[in-house]
Amino acid sequence: MSSDEKGISPAHKTSTPTHRSASSSTSSQRESRQSIHVLERTASSSTEPSVSRQLLEPEPIPLSKEADSWEIIEGLKIGQTNVQKPDRHEGFMLKKRKWPLKGWHKRFFVLDNGMLKYSKAPLDIQKGKVHGSIDVGLSVMSIKKKARRIDLDTEEHIYHLKVKSQDWFDAWVSKLRHHRLYRQNEIVRSPRDASFHIFPATSTAESSPAANVSVVDGKMQPNSFPWQSPLPCSNSLPATCTTGQSKVAAWLQDSEEMDRCAEDLAHCQSNLVELSKLLQNLEILQRTQSAPNFTDMQANCVDISKKDKRVTRRWRTKSVSKDTKIQLQEGPPAKGQFNTTRRRQRLAAAVATTVPFSATMSPVRLHSSNPNLCADIEFQTPPSHLTDPLESSTDYTKLQEEFCLIAQKVHSLLKSAFNSIAIEKEKLKQVVSEQDHNKGHSTQMARLRQSLSQALNQNAELRSRLNRIHSESTICDHVVSVNIIPSPDEPGEQIHVSLPLSQQVANESRLSMSESVSEFFDAQEVLLSASSSENEASDDESYISDVSDNISEDNTSVADNISRQILNGELTGGAFRNGRRTCLPAPCPDTSNINLWNILRNNIGKDLSKVSMPVELNEPLNTLQHLCEEMEYSELLDKASETDDPYERMVLVAAFAVSGYCSTYFRAGSKPFNPVLGETYECIREDKGFRFFSEQVSHHPPISACHCESKNFVFWQDIRWKNKFWGKSMEILPVGTLNVTLPKYGDYYVWNKVTTCIHNILSGRRWIEHYGEVTLRNTKSSVCICKLTFVKVNYWNSNVNEVQGVVIDQEGKVVHRLFGKWHEGLYCGVAPSAKCIWRPGSLPTNYELYYGFTRFAVELNELDPVLKDLLPPTDARFRPDQRFLEEGNLEAAAAEKQRVEELQRSRRRYMEENNLEHIPKFFKKVIDANQREAWVSNDTYWELRKDPGFSKVDSPVLW
């Protein structure tokens, strides 16, 4: 190979002209950055990671004094530890796009704790849309002041940055320098980020850990290591130590493995110091043979013409950057083959006379330390009159062999130390596990004793209360026996309702639970008879729902109301002899094979109430029964009717308004039946003390009206439903007001409903959402108002179904704060001392198989044989398609649904042809105070039901 080919790199020789022209600047800068890496990371052996040397960088090496040259930013100096935490810095810079893309693009950068993140805009950073992240502590940073350029080399990529103004450039350089030093200091100090810092990188024996090892009587003292804490003596142990602690102390004092490990580490450290010296000698010996003069190289570089640069690239004989990869020769050296001390002295003398001190510090490619030097220049090695080439080669080989032997010793010592630590680790695990096992047994025994003591006390208290109840029950001999439902087969059978005793048991249970449960007032349940489905389902649930610290012990208004209605025969139609059902006859059908897109694609943005749906998408309830389902927690209104504080009454009414939405949480997979015009529904609940009826008063637009009355309250509403399908979701927009009156205080509350949205209509798991604002007002008093907000789920808010509200007095001051979730409960106050106002009851078993119905919803469509003669023929319980779906007969349900809808269309056509108008039977239209049409009860339903009965009243044929 000719002399001209010696300085030509392989990359220059093999690169094509096209590739060279596309990325000439990028490849040259990448080569420069790689050279800078080698400059900052001093060549190390395989046992010392390069990152530790990169973090502890030498003084900055200016590449040129001119303003247009690159300058390497210095890193953390050895011994520099007091780096203050920098402030966060952000702003826009220009970033050069990676090859093959071109041009500078504006990006927003954020520098925080040594990490440089960038994105297109500040909003993207807030959203977490980061385009890239750079650890400036592990990057090589170089700047070019004249061009206002900043380059960050992370080994994987080179980031080219540019700043428009000089002030911004100086600010960014200052901040990057500070963050870089801080990040490097954190990496050195943190064992997690710098696990390779086992031994301090020092060059003097005084500062090395090996110097801290003391030898007494020929044995190594482990306490001399700075990282090893002194072993505790027996005198330092407390007198009341447990057996496990004594075992730990004995293990710490008697263990020999740790002493052996400390001794191995001491020898290993000595060998490492020897390896470090050998490595320096190897580097010195290698550079004494090939180190050129910087002045000559710069002069030669200037004289090179452009024509010479275009000469075809040739391969270099050997890359100088690979000098760091020392080729170790296998096999130990022969005895007496060389003298290490004499060879080191000769090498030191040669270095002192010929090699500059700066050249002895880093064995790198010389053009890397100064980019102004040409990388392709031929370096002529000056003749050396101090060292013989053959002798230097022999010394170099012997140093390599010695280096290999000592490295093998270090490896074996480290392996032995690791085995010792592993043995001690297993011992410590056994001791700690035994200690934890004993401690766990003692803790469990203490808990069992405490639980047993509490159970004994509770048993004694319950026995005393049971005796008191028994004694009082024997005194109270009179029992109200009412023949609620006479049976034709057994005319003498009666259902005995022991009102005084049941009321007494309820009061006792309320007392016992209020002592052990935290304060909250939930839906009040009155334990009356075996006909209550909640009592049969779960006694504990009825007790818990009856708890309230604010309920007086002599509060018997609901019980008196129910007993009065039972005695007067007003609620006989709702009494079920065998109790209410707890499960539907058949589970819900599979709807996975229904293609909703074919049904809904032509109805986007339209009202879906006019679109006929497959019966499989329905649930065996209709909208009129849904209105009754909102009365599930009517006990909140009963409680409000007994609360004197107007602010607390408003809180209870607000809780009732929220409770009407909880049953919809598991019902997103199906929709209720649309009532036909003139359809009705009634519900009498003796256990809750109310009677309810509803009617479909209009078909286009669909309007449903209902009325519910009790001794403590009157509730009514008329709702107009509007359904909108938007492709992936469906919105249900209710229009109307809800009304509640409390006769005892003369209060009249009104409020509105919020928007309901069902997501993932066509695919995925459907889920329901309620959002909007609700304003509750007492039109008879301006003492306070309540504002509730059903929070809408958005991209940045992960909390779903949240409800927030406040009760405000006349002056606008917040009296009560409300918060919670509409499917979990509502709380009043500030957490964690907030008081639970309402909490939903438990769901029945396998509710997901039965349309997600609650216990109350399961009972709504139940038809007792005795009720058939008492209900009007327009009642929803008689609707055939709904009944077939409940029983699981899909074919019959689909056929009946089509027949019922066609029958309604024919009635509408007949009325339009004859100019007839439908007149609701049980509701009338009025104009309220807001000049809005409203539907209220005409007070004829219960009168007709009582006399002469619906069987004797003409009713339209709906199915």
Curated annotation (Swiss-Prot):
Induction or repression: By acetylated low-density lipoprotein and dietary intake of cholesterols.
SMART domains reported for this sequence: PH
Family matches, as InterPro entries: OSBP_sf, Oxysterol-bd, Oxysterol-bd_CS, PH-like_dom_sf, PH_8, PH_domain
GO MF: lipid binding; lipid transporter activity
Tissue: Expressed in skin, respiratory epithelium, small intestine epithelium, pancreas, striated muscle, brain, spinal ganglia, and nervous plexus of the intestine (at protein level). In the brain, specifically in the cerebellum, it is expressed in Purkinje and granule cells. Expressed in hepatocytes and macrophages.
Keywords: Acetylation, Cell membrane, Cytoplasm, Endoplasmic reticulum, Endosome, Lipid transport, Lipid-binding, Membrane, Nucleus, Phosphoprotein, Transport
Organism domain of life: Eukaryota
Subcellular location: Nucleus envelope; Cytoplasm, Cytosol; Endoplasmic reticulum membrane; Cell membrane
Residue span of region Disordered: 1-60
Subunit comment: Homodimer. Interacts with OSBPL3.
Name listed for the protein in its UniProt record: Oxysterol-binding protein-related protein 6
Native source organism of the sequence: Mus musculus (Mouse)
Gene responsible for this protein: Osbpl6
